[in-house]
Amino acid sequence: MVPIFLKIFFYGFSTNKSKLSEGFQSEQSNNIIENNFHNLFHGNFNTNFLNNNNNNNNNNNNNNNNNNNNNNNNNNNNNNNNIIISSPILSASPSLSPRFQDILENNSVSINIQSSISESPPNSTDWQLEKFDDSMGMISSVISLREQQQQQQQQQQQQQQQQQQQQQQQQQQQQQQQNQQQINLQYQNLQEHCPQNQSHNQSHQQKQNNSTQIPLVQNNQQNLETFSISILDENFNNSGILSMFGEKCKKPKFPHSSIDQYQNLPSDIKMIVENISKMSNFSTQEEIVSVTFKFAFFLTNLSEKTLKILHDSISIFNKIEDLFFQIFLPQSNLIPEIYLKEYILNLFSHLCEREHFLVFNTLKLPLNFMFLCRSYFESFDRLDKIQQNQQLQIQQQNQQQNQQHYNNNNNNNNNNNNNNNNNNNNNNNNNNNNNNNNNNNNNNQQQQTHLQQQYHNYNNNFPITSINIQQQQQQLQPIDIQQLNINNSQNNQNNIQLEQPINHQNQNIYQQFQQFPNQVPSNQNLVGNDIFDTSIITIPQNNISSSQPSFLQQSPPLTHHPSSTQLVNNNLYQFDSNNQQQFQIHYTSPSFIGALASINNNNTTNNINFDNSGNTTTTTTTTTITTTTKTSNNHNSNDNVIINPNGSFLHTIPQEYRTKGSKINLSRKINKSPKGVISPKYRSILPRFGFKMKDLEERSNINGENYIRSRKGVATLINTYLTPISAEMSTKRESKCGVVICIKDHDQHSSVSIVPRLYPMSNGSKDGVEKFVFHKNVISIVCPGVFSHSYSVNRLDRNQRGFFIRYSFYMGKEEIDYVHTPIIRYKNTPSDFDQPSRVLLGHVISLHPVTQNGIVAVKFIAISNLLKKGLITKNITTSTSNLINNENNNENNNNYNGNINSNNNNNEEIEEEEENNNSSGGSSEDDDSDSKVKATRMGKPLEIILYEKNLQFHLTIPQHISKVNPEDKWRFPETLITETNDPKKSKNSSEIIHFVSSYLIEFACIIPRGNYEIIFRYENVNKTVHPIYYSI
């Protein structure tokens, strides 16, 4: 007979064994384990679940012990019936995912479970069974004994559990600190590769539960179902990518019902999903949906712009599947739904710029990318708080500013009220004074009439003697009423000036300034007109002297500077025509700063310093500058420094390249600019034609930089469009622009000597033979620290094609620095010059009346390195012999030195040569008429060709009106082409192209609007031309 107790025990064991046979393979156990995974990692595990499993294990062990002659019962008793369950037991299950196994292996949890078998001596169970047959009363005593033993064991177990829990808490804290340090190091390493670098050090929590329930967003206002992901087998290999824990990532799998919902997605979403699937290793539609299903539903809420960015960025990734698994799936359950849409947009917009670099580092780094993304999105909360704090600070600042403005307005109102009261009091006082004056006048008149009457009566009654008459006249001298009124009015005015409020003067200033015009005159012809510039000049009150007019003591919205305005060393000096007083005005734009300077005959500089009080102090310094020049033995050298009385180049030089040190005060007005450089007034109109300072400061001679610094930084050569260095030179032709040299610190190098030397381009002067020599070599001082080198060159070796100038700077006998010019090409004659290739072009629409629609009158300004004014082609009559002789002479002159005076310009040279030819040809008039032939003097004037492809419009703009086609003459009316912005010259009505300087021309015509291809070329010169494209 089997005892009832054993039946109950075996029944319990069999039931537990049947449950144990299912093990951890059941889906229910999997769900329970994975749902409690997060609590297990943080020490908060479901004790009921573990107690049940441990009891099952205990019963299984007891059953095995009975089958093996009860060998394991002693082991259970020796362990005090405490079963320790650690993570390797759980990780033995084949159905657990590798990320759970890894965490469980590193974070084991021991839990004490009370055994169902009491601790008793050996064979205690047999003793109890034998007594059971004899007497049932013994059961109650055994049960009571077991209860006592169980209570004692429970107390011991509770104590042990408390100790173990304390130890576990300490271990967890240490492990959390270690994990936190590792995560911080990983976060710092990955900060450079985060889509948006966030500089917020936020504490990272431990690994959280990667929930198996994925909530899907709403699509077309329908709530989609929630699908659970079942983790595949551990041995399943995907594509060899790195997961968030460094292991192979597993494909999530959705139920088959999701495929039908996938078919209902929009076409744009499907196209993106198909692009992802083409670059992946999936073989079935189910696998495609399992990877992209959730991401596809997130895409339904994105805008078209975001979808386009996403679609375009997919084609540039070689491992889009890896990127998808690595970035989106691991942290998609951790990212809040409201941030995921913004995250996708920011991520792909950032990856489009740094796709290769960021994707490579993202896929190759064996770090926990989930924690990085999690910390990134947790920083959104901090960013929101920071933004809120910033907004609060801004609001507080605005409130403070508003309060300050309110207080200031109140103070101003109070001051105005006080001033008004004072004015009222002054007016009352004036009225009282006027009344008193009137009363006094009345009294005086009455007294005077009374005295006159008395005097008349006295004369009638008494005899008149000379003494009495004189005394009486002294006593009865009449009062001058007009003088009395004048004195009273002066006293009143003095009282008013003493008590006048401050704002009264400002009102006068504003009223006076309103009289100035508010806009630039519409007439493009600026000869004799003043310039009104609204953008580049302001007047700070600290720099205005007290002796200035009232309208200059306040910063107005417009600034009027008349035609006599002079710019000197970052200051604008104005000269009054009456007293020649100078007023300093600050010139804000350093790119437009200019000056006209001069030096007196004693080489002294008068520096005017303005202080805050408006007083001026003048200091005088004497500068000594020596310059030596090297010329050929056949030419006379000029060793003296020539001071240029005609102005300076300073308005074309930016402030950072100006000289530092003493400045020069102008002793007289100067209206002219140096030869070859535009005037400051003409420079001020270039922005109206569309020229920008950035373009004007580009290099003119393409063989060098725009600002060529010396080796040690002592000096700088200017090579811009406004101050160019010639790119080509001919025999003895003077360079009109020359070379402008700026010394950086004039005070330190006040006695510097500049020595220019010529070197051939082929560096063939090593043999000691000169290849080039200066025909003219003059260095003139514009102002202290700024020099202009005027030169002309003669070639001694015909094989040389170019040269450069080396400027050596000496302090005494020591060379302190040097600098080279760009390469300058050498031509036999100006007619051999290349066609203008690099041309800056600007235009304005003129107000000239035009009747046809789409046709406008346009005025152009063109700037290039060298624009040559050629001679107009003419027919001459001369004898054959003289023609041949003249041609031979011209060839000889062109091949070598020539007989042209270098002091004249190119036009004068050609005209003089032509006159000589004509005079020599005139001596053959006595010869037979048969010996006379007609010869053509081939000139090479400048011409401009405009071509509009769409309109098939073609127009040639010649240098002279005589070369215009008869059908195009109406496009060049005299009133249009004679208008010029050049204040130095009046334009001839026969000149269509007007040469303002050696590098700037202006011309005008009537043409239709369109996109033009413009060519600048010289007539009768067969060389390559480079067109420019211009829109009107």
Swiss-Prot record:
Region ranges (Disordered): 54-80, 391-451, 884-934
Residue ranges, compositional bias (Low complexity): 884-907
Superkingdom of origin organism: Eukaryota
Entry protein name: Uncharacterized protein DDB_G0289975
